[in-house]
């Protein structure tokens, strides 16, 4: 009985792990804002700048004036379950999503000063279980192939340190999902459970 309970528990944990996962993205610049400082590669490298750090250092993408947009391409249709991002604390930012790179709709609005940092870079998250969760970030999961971010208001000096998405490939995506490590673990545990049950019968 104990073995069966252990197997069922592990199966449940593996099933949860197989669902939501970080979404891999490719970043590009779009818009008419002109020059920006920093490398686009810092926006999706998984590294969040230190909070309250200076807005225009090399580990961020920074610029002056509105017009710049930075696009995150998922490579397939994904359901976005949560967003975690690092931006300059005293500016407003808009994230929009699209399935076709043509029609865009609002995904998330980040208002100036909603985080806990009073100066410099602030990390914020929509996931209530994240230590950086900000309750003022109204977020609804959406299916998208692209997300873009742009500045909307503030002191005209803007900065983004990281934008990370968590979710899973949508059922109607263009390709069949490749089994992830968590999914393979789920299969292995299922087979192990069947083996234990069979051994008890013999």
What are these regions (language model features)?
Residues 1-4, 180, 197-202:
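Positively charged n-region of N-terminal signal peptides that target proteins for export
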Residues 2-8, 183-186:
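Sec-dependent signal peptide recognition
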Residues 8-14:
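Bacterial N-terminal signal peptides
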Residues 16-20:
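Sec/Tat signal peptide C-region and signal peptidase I cleavage site
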Residues 21, 53-110, 133-177:
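Aromatic, loop-rich ligand-recognition surfaces of beta-strand-rich domains
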Residues 22-52:
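Predominantly extracellular/luminal regions of secreted and cell-surface proteins
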Residues 108-136:
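Extracellular carbohydrate recognition and processing domains
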Residues 179-197:
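A short, hydrophobic C-terminal helix/tail in secreted or cell-surface proteins
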């Amino acid at each position: 009985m104990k073995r069966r309970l252990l197997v069922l528990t592990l199966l449940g944990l593996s099933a949860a792990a197989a669902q939501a996962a970080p979404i891999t993205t490719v970043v590009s610049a779009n818009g008419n804002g002109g020059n920006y400082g920093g490398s686009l590669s810092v926006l999706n490298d998984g590294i969040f700048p230190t909070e309250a750090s200076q807005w225009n250092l090399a580990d961020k993408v920074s610029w002056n004036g509105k017009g710049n947009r930075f696009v995150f391409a998922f490579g397939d249709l994904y359901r976005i379950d949560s967003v975690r991002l690092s931006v300059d604390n005293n500016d407003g930012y808009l994230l929009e999503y699209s399935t076709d790179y043509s029609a865009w709709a609002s995904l998330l609005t980040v208002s100036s000063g909603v985080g806990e940092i009073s100066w410099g870079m602030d990390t914020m998250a929509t996931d209530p279980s994240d230590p950086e969760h900000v309750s003022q970030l109204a977020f609804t999961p959406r299916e998208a192939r692209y997300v873009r971010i742009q500045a909307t208001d503030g002191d005209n000096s803007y900065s983004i340190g990281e934008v990370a998405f968590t979710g899973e490939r949508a059922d109607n995506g263009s390709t069949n999902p490749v089994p992830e490590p968590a999914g393979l673990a789920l299969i292995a545990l299922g087979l192990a459970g069947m083996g234990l049950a069979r051994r008890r019968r013999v």
